[in-house]
Amino acid sequence: MVEDIIIVSTPYVPGYKITKTYGFTWGLIVRSRGIGGNIIASLRTIFGGEIHEYTELLNQSRQYALDRMKQHAREMGANAVVSVGFDSSDIGQNMSEVLAFGTAVTVEPETAASSPVRLG
């Protein structure tokens, strides 16, 4: 895992100001479900309910994509990624693609002088 990269889904980081924008950053992974997982999943679709094998595969894939996005942002010189989102799709019948994306930025803690005054 890439540490020390702030990740938020909002276009700003609360308590920080953006001092530099590097641009679009992403992390992508394509994973195969495998024949064993497909057989088990096919059996589960007959009876209904959650397909745990696919859920775990997609959770792992999201984490890998997020880690790759963080690494890409770090290579760009960023210490944060704002406006983070995910996208996923199937490729063929046995593969899934997961994309993590956002805007790589440098942020610094806001000082009391630069913080907006909030009333009430």
From Swiss-Prot:
Xref: InterPro entries: UPF0145_dom_sf (IPR035439), UPF0145_YbjQ-like (IPR002765)
Source organism superkingdom: Archaea
- SUPFAM superfamilies listed in its UniProt record: YbjQ-like
Pfam families listed in its UniProt record: YbjQ_1 (PF01906)
Name the family the entry cites: Belongs to the UPF0145 family.
What's the protein called, per UniProt?
UPF0145 protein UNCMA_30400
Q: Give the source species.
A: Methanocella arvoryzae (strain DSM 22066 / NBRC 105507 / MRE50)
